[in-house]
A protein has these predicted regions:
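Conserved class I S-adenosyl-L-methionine
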Residues: 1-47, 49-56
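A short acidic, Gly/Pro-enriched loop at the edge of an enzyme's catalytic core
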Residues: 108-115
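Residues lining the SAM
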Residues: 119-121
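A short glycine-rich, Lys/Arg-flanked "PGG" loop and its adjoining helix->strand segment in the class I
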Residues: 133-145
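SAM-dependent methyltransferase
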Residues: 150-188
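Class I SAM-dependent methyltransferase SAM/SAH-binding core
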Residues: 63-106
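Conserved SAM/SAH-binding loop
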Residues: 59
Length: 188
């Protein structure tokens, strides 16, 4: 059996996240985190002491707020510098959170969680639907029987309604150009 080189997915590029992180996780995003965490707690019917898996937790924006609400949080992300920042924030806020550096396509846990969350549209990054299904199966396997998965994503209808091919904007002292394109299954 020969070793086949697999192509690296764009979201596995740590430099991308280090450059884009200040734009993606600006002050406005951090300011909204407490309200989002409370909404997650209500949606998932969680109580103090319940366990939550924060899938693709990034720099811990939601993980820390969930922990401040009294939940036992485990955050998983592929980008180690984000996890380092998340650990520092958790320490500064006086909460204990387990952060794990792992790709969700291969993550597994012996621990079972009352709920899992994936916030800020980080689901659907994979080029292959089979990888998205793998992630959903991994999350399901990590949940206790009857556990809840709160998944934030943009619906097709919303994406189409607000679609733009690109835009320029200023944020975090940078000028940013975004470019978007539609690929398959969006017709009609």
């Amino acid at each position: 059996m020969k070793n086949e080189k697999t192509e690296t997915e764009w979201f596995e590029n740590e430099d991308f996240w280090l450059n884009y992180g200040p734009i993606m996780f600006d002050g406005q995003q951090w300011a909204q985190a407490a309200g989002i965490a409370k909404s997650v707690m209500n949606l998932a019917r969680l109580s103090e002491g319940n366990s939550v898996l924060d899938v693709c937790c990034g720099p811990g924006r939601i993980s820390v707020e969930l922990a401040l609400l009294g939940l036992n949080v485990t955050g998983v992300d592929i980008t180690q510098p984000f996890l380092d920042a998340a650990s520092e924030t958790a320490q500064d806020e006086g909460v204990q959170i387990e952060f794990i550096n792992k790709d969700m396509r291969v993550f597994s846990s012996r621990k079972k969680f009352d709920a899992a969350v994936n916030i800020y549209n980080s689901f659907g990054y994979c080029d292959r639907i089979s990888d998205d299904i793998k992630i959903l199966k991994k999350v399901n396997a990590a949940l206790k029987k009857g556990g809840t998965f709160v998944l934030e994503c943009i619906s097709r209808e919303t994406a189409v309604k607000y679609f733009t091919e690109g835009e320029w904007f200023e944020r975090a002292g940078m000028t940013v150009l975004t470019e978007f394109k539609v690929q398959g299954a969006w017709e009609g």
